């Protein structure tokens, strides 16, 4: 299916028990009003602890480059022919970028710890930051919203290269990478969602990927809905 552009992406952090961190004093995200908050389009329920990187909250998401989706292949030869083929485990990565994520959000996501001096520090033996990610794109020809979801992974910071020249300063944007891993409860590595599928429901997708529901409940609703929670047949 053709996809055009990057609408937004949503990220969050987990605590040591695998629960989404909702308390900003314990490593959760902070908000400026409703900017960055994620809501269920049907019930208007807020999904606490999640942050949406979009035009309003971060001057726009600019990149979600996915690599490592394919399994590695190893060929075993015998008698001058390929006798056996084995496949390894996929090792996905999502390289993310945005124009202006609030620093309190991006620094916390990559594991920096705020101190009383107004700084965000990383010590020599930093603990990995576990979190998840949902990337949102769109197919305009069939009006399909597409979501690529990673329920679990480790966030690491991107590089920072500050420069200037004789005329203009060089603009540097936010960058980070999610190294995906399978979720322990169900071994889910990643999942694709399509808004035109009969079982799709935005709110249930969020709850399933973030671990707020123990099973995939998206199949309970057999009527496809758009991102506003309205049945497609009503359009």
Each predicted region: which residue ranges?
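Exposed beta-sheet edge/beta-hairpin loop segments within beta-rich domains
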Residues: 85-88, 122-125, 162-172
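Oligomerization/assembly interface segments of phage tail-like spikes and tubes
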Residues: 82-105, 170-183
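Core alpha/beta structural scaffold of self-assembling particle/tube/pore-forming proteins
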Residues: 3, 43, 102-129, 196, ...
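Mixed-charge, glycine-accented linear interaction segment located at domain edges/termini
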Residues: 153-235
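N-terminal, charged/glycine-rich beta-strand/loop interface patches
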Residues: 56-84, 88-93
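Polar/acidic, low-complexity leader/linker segments enriched in S/T/G and N/D
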Residues: 1-59, 230-235
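Extracellular structured ligand-interaction cores
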Residues: 6, 91-93, 130-132, 145-147, ...
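Short helix-loop boundary/capping segments
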Residues: 110-117, 121-163
